[in-house]
Amino acid sequence: MTNYNVFNQSNRPLFTQLTNTFSAPGIEASPDSGAAAAGSFFALTTNNTSIPSNQNLLLQILNAAGSGRTIRISSLTGGTTAAATLVIYSGGTVTVGSTPVPVNTLLGNTNASVVTTRQNTGTLGGTFTSIASIPLTAGIFSLDLNGSIIVPPGQTLSISVGTGNQTAAINLFWWEF
């Protein structure tokens, strides 16, 4: 890097050094933005789902042991029509009701996510550990996790919203590398 003379001489104009110019911008972007531009950022939604009495809306992603990629959870959003509890779990078992397909947020990109997905209403089974439990009021929710929850190969992340007699949605966003 060039060392610039920081002292002005009386016969010259005031010294300036332009930074963040159009030809050399100094712009910072989030990891989400970089992952999206690289075709490695994904979205998964349950859409609006009616939850029967005494059940939960469940969404799960499984990162297979041999996938070769690590999942970093960017954010978790959604909504509910009544008071509920949002719980994020490590592990657990969701009986397959449907297998929603993750969408690459670089629209038109053919890169596919390595995760296996499961969605259903019911109760989470198997062995699991709660990471976070958040009481919700009716309305929208949004958690910016900024990659702070990591799902390495061979691990599972499960999310539940409930319990029942309401309509809810879960939207999960992550990047893979």
Task: Describe the residue ranges of each PLM region.
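Beta-strand-centric surfaces of beta-sandwich/beta-rich domains
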Residues: 1-15, 20, 27-177
